[in-house]
Amino acid sequence: MLILRGAPALSAFRHSKLLEQLKQKVSAVSGLYAEFAHFADVNDVLTSEEQQVLDRLLKYGPSVPVQEPSGRLFLVLPRFGTISPWSSKASDIARNCGLSKIQRLERGIAFYVEGQFSETEAQAIADSLHDRMTQLVLGDLEQAANLFSHAQPKPLTAVDILGGGRAALEKANVELGLALAEDEIDYLITSFNGLGRNPHDIELMMFAQANSEHCRHKIFNASWDIDGQSQEKSLFGMIKNTYQMHSEGVLSAYKDNASVIVGNVAGRFFPDPETRQYGAVQEPVHILMKVETHNHPTAIAPFPGAATGSGGEIRDEGATGRGAKPKAGLTGFTVSNLQIPGFVQPWEVPYGKPERIVTALDIMIEGPLGGAAFNNEFGRPALTGYFRTFEQSITTPHGDEVRGYHKPIMLAGGMGNIREDHVQKGEITVGSKLIVLGGPAMLIGLGGGAASSMATGTSSADLDFASVQRENPEMERRCQEVIDRCWQLGDRNPISFIHDVGAGGLSNAFPELVNDGDRGGRFELRNVPNDEPGMAPLEIWSNESQERYVLAVGVEDFERFKAICERERCPFAVVGEATAEPQLTVTDSHFGNSPVDMPLEVLLGKAPRMHRSVAREEEIGDDFDPSTLDIEESVQRVLRHPAVASKSFLITIGDRSITGLVARDQMVGPWQVPVADCAVTATSFDVNTGEAMAMGERTPLALLDAPASGRMAIGETLTNIAASLIEKLSDIKLSANWMSAAGHPGEDARLYDTVKAVGMELCPELGITIPVGKDSMSMKTRWSDEGTEKSVTSPLSLIVTGFAPVVDIRQTLTPELRMDKGITDLILIDLGRGQNRMGASILAQTHGKLGRVAPDVDDAEDLKAFFAVIQGLNSDGHILSYHDRSDGGLLVSTLEMAFAGHCGLNLHLDGVADNVSELSAILFNEELGAVIQVRQDATPLVLAQFSAAGLEDCVAVIGQPINNDEVSISFHGEPVFSGQRRLLQRQWAETSYQIQRLRDNAECADQEFDALLEEDNPGLTVKLGFDVNDDIAAPYIKTGVRPQVAVLREQGVNGQVEMAAAFDRAGFNAIDVHMSDILAGRVDLNDFKGMVACGGFSYGDVLGAGEGWAKSALFNSRARDAFQGFFERSDSFTLGVCNGCQMLSNLHELIPGSEFWPHFVRNRSEQFEARVAMVQVQESASIFLQGMAGSRMPIAIAHGEGHAEFRNDDALLEADVSGTVALRFVDNHGKVTETYPANPNGSPRGIGGMTTLDGRVTIMMPHPERVFRAVQNSWRPEDWNEDGAWMRMFRNARAWVN
């Protein structure tokens, strides 16, 4: 084994933060130093040349001064017997670089901690430095040799029920954490007595996972009686009623991994499977929709919990039908009170929590990062979501109890697209190969399905921790590329059947696959790819290692499937074959036995149906009179409540422009304020139709009136999605996610009554279907605190997500108040019809109260009329701005509109209030409704339309936006409230800022927060030195000659399709080229005029961002020759964007004229930054930027490592004067800047892109390929038609070729 020291592992900011954490744990800690340690398992001595290559490979990341370590060593390594995702990718890179003597590379972090501490304190330090699920801590570098030793497989064990009877199975139930019910234990004893043998542990685990509440939804399928009265339908039956009443537009419901609804027809853009040339195929592009929860893992380990939650939901979409493509994501969090240190709010009363789960604040720091990191690396934009906190002591008939979300809600959802012919699963023929696609088995996430079905606190902490999975998004990306290549083959798609691997691992996925295909299966356990050879059969079969799919591929299609996997470098294995008889057999060639041999009907068959006999409880509540409150104090409290406050800290960490199909993200207007009501994507690059999604949830209302909380969640979803242009209300389909503390007094009846209100009443009345959903029935946390039994129980929680096809994505409304449209009015549409019910409102919560009467949807006809009128007014161009009324009420809706429009407000409440005592309730009630901005000359017509629809009593003019910074509210001329927009916006932004400050580089957070005080910030602007609507490539396109451009990608790259679309539009033939094509000699770069290296996360950024990709080109002789030859050709051009920019900057030794280029390293904020930034095009030789010098315009940014690092100040100066700086970040006034967030990565002198001395090679961190259409821009000037300003860049390249 070779030991190679690496670079320091912590930036200055991360170092001081970790040192502070360690000092809090162990006060004797006085110093800390951390560096990477690399270990190489070699089968022979390396030559000096090979050693040099290895040394260069392992030099990556930013240049940080190296120290001589002192202090006690805590060496954090991957657990022995495992292979980390880092290791598998780094080892791949080494092999691609010709280092065949290296069998494996592995990496650890050597922490050197100074101070005098005891062994107990040393253990506390070790606990803080590692994740015991996947890592261990050593005190000696040499001990790392055990990384490369192989453990012996553990054998099978049987449970002796023939001899030991029921007691033996009850013992196994506890030890293995199976969560079997009494009747299931009886069922298993009967079944195995019938088979005449003892069950193996693997069979029991498999049964427990397949029949867990998590997988079987027993409560939703149960029979019920309430208060002694038998109920006619099950919960699931009532949800399905919505489909039975209105099934039009639904292509698949309740039977697959996601549901499918009818989409628009467009030119679906992808590479031809034979020629690899990108092109558009005109066809229906149907919409798939799915929303999942990952609550249990997120409570225990928020980053991996939320990451694998997102990953699992993405796999559900990809595994729909015969293979589909995920498109856009959403995320949601509900937690208990945050109690931010130094920012604890008056309503946040400390109650404590069990040891086994983390705090609400930790969940909101780590969880969103996990979810965002997975989506970012996979390459899916995160476009909408919600965030709520709730934790309150309430009085019930049984005494006081705390209701809240110690077991959080972590919601991961999204939509995708699927071809019409692939919506339904195919046939599994006898003899079909049963394949696992994706990563290897590892001992992680064991028993997750059963664990998440228990109330937190009823299983052991070790079992809880073992049930959390770990993520590897780059592997999932590779799997998705395989699935994409398969569905792109159309009727030659080799996939006949596909499922994702989730709860229960292969033990759930393979039986489900063959059972759904009406087959049995025969499997060989040792064919499962396995990175932990010491696992027992149960562990191999049931672990929940992520990023895996199971597929059935016909024998005749297998070679085609295999070739696709090899090109994409995606691991797969044939584990079994389909049989005619419905028997499940798993053989084990290592031990020569059969760990599983049972009829599928025993596993999945007649397990007893649950019956629930429950009683209703009287409703609870307390008195709350808002009229006695000080309005200024109320405003301040409400604006700081997390459900109301800015969600910026959740949004800028997630890529919102990847795919180039995003038409509406959360950030609105020239000042990019996070207030959008819905998310909208384009169907494809050639149309203006699309898809919308929006969310609704009002969970605290369930404590007062559970059915009202369900109806309000649906109502809010509709008032949110109404901002997009949708043909008719029934086009909207809903996902319903139900969370409940089943068994808690009154909760089961509340659940039943709410499902009935939604499924049997409101949805049928609206003509809306719920074709998909998910339930989580164990929303309670119990623990003992110094002998006192404590518990926190969540309210019944229905989270609704709406999806719909969109008629015209250019007509999506936003809350941005327009000050350039003359005199305008603000009109309130109050669907509560003046009732102003305050129950469970944010205002009540910020005073520790609930109130008594919840807002509700009293009449479905009002909601239908509202939707129709808004759609009509939008279609006719009458609405300038739109925002729904929700958390915080009318006051918050109008303030958010003013924040987005950077203007003041003059509100007068004369038309909506009768007396002063009503004013607080009018400003803060959360009844359904919306505020719209219309031109004053159109106000009579707009009011008349509402009147004609029966909503005359719901509408009133409440004021006007004004062109200054003042917010004033009056009643009959008397002032009610006044404030400055800037200061109110700071209050609204402060909760987000406080979390950002704890999580990211505090200096950056401070700069962004202070920028809100700037008075004359003009926002994003456009100043062009060319005509955006002038197509300079048109004459060349007319000739019919289309030069070829190689759209280059490596494993983990995810931005190739939109890049190809931009070049295709400019008149090129874009060809899909994988690095594996170049390494294998399948592709010759001499066939291409241009090459573009695309964005993403090549090798998951292992060995540095873009560095692994570059080094596999530098140190592979065939690839090096190919690239060098291409760069030296005077008729060739090259573009590198984001990850491609990082990659090309590391290839500078092959690129003539690139000697001034920097190295790109971690952003100054230490965070992934997804924003719209202003850049100025510099005077340079770049062939892409000719005629654009001096132009200033917005561009999409999405990167974690974009900081341009030069060797020293002289090198920076040389670059500056060499004329090779192509782009610089500027502030909204047009000045070159290093200030955050205008300069999102902190690059010196605002450097955002470089070119070569002759201009043929250009690299940049921003993403022009994501904003080449006008509609792709989060904000754009109104005079832009089809093209965005950045389209000019691609047309310049086409003109240059001629």
From Swiss-Prot:
Pathway: Purine metabolism; IMP biosynthesis via de novo pathway; 5-amino-1-(5-phospho-D-ribosyl)imidazole from N(2)-formyl-N(1)-(5-phospho-D-ribosyl)glycinamide: step 1/2. It catalyses: N(2)-formyl-N(1)-(5-phospho-beta-D-ribosyl)glycinamide + L-glutamine + ATP + H2O = 2-formamido-N(1)-(5-O-phospho-beta-D-ribosyl)acetamidine + L-glutamate + ADP + phosphate + H(+). Keywords: ATP-binding, Cytoplasm, Glutamine amidotransferase, Ligase, Magnesium, Metal-binding, Nucleotide-binding, Purine biosynthesis. It comes from the Bacteria. InterPro entries: Class_I_gatase-like, FGAR-AT_N, FGAR-AT_PurM_N-like, PurL_large, PurL_linker, PurM-like_C_dom, PurM-like_C_sf, PurM-like_N_sf. It holds the Pfam family GATase_5. Its main location: cytoplasm. Transmembrane segments: none annotated. GO terms for biological process: 'de novo' IMP biosynthetic process. The active site is at C1138 (nucleophile), H1263, E1265. Coiled coil: none annotated. Residues 303-327 are annotated as: Disordered. Mg(2+) binds at D677, E716, N720, D884. The keyword S-adenosyl-L-methionine does not apply. One of its GO terms (cellular component) is cytoplasm. GO terms for molecular function: ATP binding; metal ion binding; phosphoribosylformylglycinamidine synthase activity. Residues 1045-1298 form the Glutamine amidotransferase type-1 domain. NCBIfam families: FGAM_synt (TIGR01735), PRK05297.1 (NF003672). In the N-terminal section; belongs to the FGAMS family. Phosphoribosylformylglycinamidine synthase involved in the purines biosynthetic pathway. Catalyzes the ATP-dependent conversion of formylglycinamide ribonucleotide (FGAR) and glutamine to yield formylglycinamidine ribonucleotide (FGAM) and glutamate. Monomer. PANTHER family: PHOSPHORIBOSYLFORMYLGLYCINAMIDINE SYNTHASE. This is Phosphoribosylformylglycinamidine synthase. It comes from Pseudomonas syringae pv. syringae (strain B728a). The gene is purL.
